[in-house]
Amino acid sequence: MDFEQLAKIENESERVNRTYDIFNEESRLNHSKAARVEFITTVHYIEKYLKEGDKILDIGAGAGEYSFYFARKGYEISALELADANIEAFKKKLTPEDKINLVQGNALDLSCYEDKSFDIVFLFGPLYHLKNNEDKQKCIEEAKRVCKDGGKIFFAFISNDFVFLTEFGYDSNYFSNGDYDKDTFKLNDFPFVFHTVEAARNLLHKSDINILHEVASDGASELLAMRINEMSEEDYAQYLRYHFYICEKPEMIGMSNHLLFVGKKR
């Protein structure tokens, strides 16, 4: 499978499925100091709200990085994932001790879960892929439906605006030949879907989500990966303190490859 073949797949679910024949989600969040910034940040915000005995649903669970982390802290996890490659990687790591109920399915249809059955819901993968606004809203509404009243939903987006600088770091000609609208600076939504901070915020407001935090979840960590990965443990710890110092500043939120929104179901 390559990008040209992927682009020819018309069915969105199948296209998303095959995307992970190309991209290795299993190692994305853990292969280096720079890569772990997003994971560390996301866990930090989840743990602000997680209580003993909470039930967690991980929608678009990938290869299970978050599911395993919280299952091994004693939480009961339900995980739903679409892509065959991710399901296979997830299953290889499952042990009898892991309290994880893994289901292969689509984030647009959570009918296997009852209304108001989870205290915490993760929506970290689906909004990287859904292009149609109606599908985005349906996905969010399904996450809301299965979340208890007052429960917390964690949303991840890929930031449209900062990706330019990250790609420029790989390709000095990106601004002349990159795959984006040269007038509006909107990236082409392939193979992933990109949102500005404002677009992500409006999407959640439209679903009546009470936004508690807007976070630059990895900041410039990919752009600065070489330097970050060279850091001593002491320097890395201080870098993370700096990252947490700036990651919710309004002027810095969009300066990140990934965005984390923490919402409360009203």
Predicted regions and their residues:
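A short SAM/SAH-binding and catalytic strip from SAM-dependent methyltransferases
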Residues: 120-134
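Short alpha-helix
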Residues: 191-208, 214
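A short acidic, Gly/Pro-enriched loop at the edge of an enzyme's catalytic core
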Residues: 111-121
